[in-house]
Amino acid sequence: MEKTKKSCRSNNSSSNDFFKKVKIYIFSLIGIIIFFIPIKINNELETIIYHISYFLENEASSIIEISLIFFIVLSIFKNILNIDKNNVNKIEICCKSFSLVILVSIFVGKEDLFFINDNLVFILKDLMLDLSITLPIASLFMPFLLEYGLVEITEAYTNRIMKKIFKVSGKVFLNFLVYILVNNVCGVFVTYKLYKDGKLRRRETAITILNFSVLSLSLTDDLCNKINIITIKFFIMEIIILIICNFIISRIYPLKKKKQSYYFKSNHKNVNCKRNKINTAIKRYYENKSNKKLLSLSLSYLNEVIYILMDLIPTIIFIFFIVNIIYNIPFIMESINNLTNIFVSAFNLPNSNLISNIINLNLFSSILAIESMPQNSYYIIKLIIGIFIALQCINFCLLIPFIKGSIIELTIGEILIVAFERLCIITFICFITYNFYCAI
């Protein structure tokens, strides 16, 4: 009789384990399909996230415009309610009000009142699309990526190699996939969310947001079409150089000096195993899992996104306005180009003036840099410039305002130092590549 009871308990336990695994596999697969697998709909090969975004952009553009205005108005009211004798708060209200005027002028087709360069307006609109549509939609589905075992499974299989090469945990690999396959807007939110929930350390967060946010598959595809280079070959080169850059930068100042502590001490347990990886990952997931339902998690993620966008959108609009002014003052751009040219010339690279101009434009926007590329350059020159565009730039128009407005502990000085370190490493690699190419 006792043997029968034990047998029944064993069968029930194995049955429960099976259904637990199936649930994790199904939910993780849904997340992978939604975020990473391109599907062809109406002759457009995109992920489900972007198909939904484009549909809403075409069918509900007026609602989106109203939503953007609503975000800024909410942000202004929030500052007004918290107003005190602090002059910084008053300046923020003025800047956000000015951003609201700029946004309305863009919506009514009067953007030339504030912007001289049409490319900057196009880039700003594209970024607003990612912020106002893609990110909120992605946030609704993001629990499938972060809350149902995929983080633990990814960490189980990639933790050892990520630790050895980049000094980060294996869960960063999943975050990297969001950066490269979705966009850096969603990627930076995933980094923020992992850090806020006590799943990433301070140093890991800094390394992730500064080292893994530079590469984008969609940008690589556009770049290769522009310079007529085979995408897969160029992408392999990007990955190799990215690994070299990140390997070095994660081991030197300032990222090396970042604290290993968490934003707060949660009960989250990391996955670090050599055997039985899938079983260990599932066990860790059930130790870490939230008791919230899927709908509650989705709404919680959306609420966080809305709260972030309230301050982020007006800040980005104002930054684009300042960039527009700087970009159209010849003296400033020439001075910056001359300084960059001195640096590039020291490495004896060809067409140093062109490379310097591309590097500086890339600080503002990769699209500006791509548009400025000449079509009739030599293959090696295209290759070098393409590497600079693809990997050199930290997106200052997005990352700096996001980081400074969030709980992520990075100073502007640290961001600029990391950007300069990457520039030096890439320039040195291009120098070696060019001299090897010439020797052949």
Model-derived features with residue positions:
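Interfacial loop-to-helix junctions that mark the boundaries of transmembrane helices
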Residues: 16-20, 49-64, 86-92, 120-129, ...
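Intrinsically disordered, low-complexity non-transmembrane regions of multi-pass membrane transporters
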Residues: 1-29, 85-86, 255-306
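Hydrophobic transmembrane alpha-helices that form the pore/transport pathway of multi-pass ion
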Residues: 1, 146-213, 371-380
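Hydrophobic alpha-helical transmembrane segments of multi-pass integral membrane proteins
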Residues: 134-147, 164-187, 341-373
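Transmembrane alpha-helix boundary signature
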Residues: 77-85, 104-119, 148
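C-terminal transmembrane helix pair
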Residues: 26-31, 200-224, 228, 239-246, ...
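Transmembrane helical segments that form the transport core of multi-pass membrane transport proteins
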Residues: 290-377
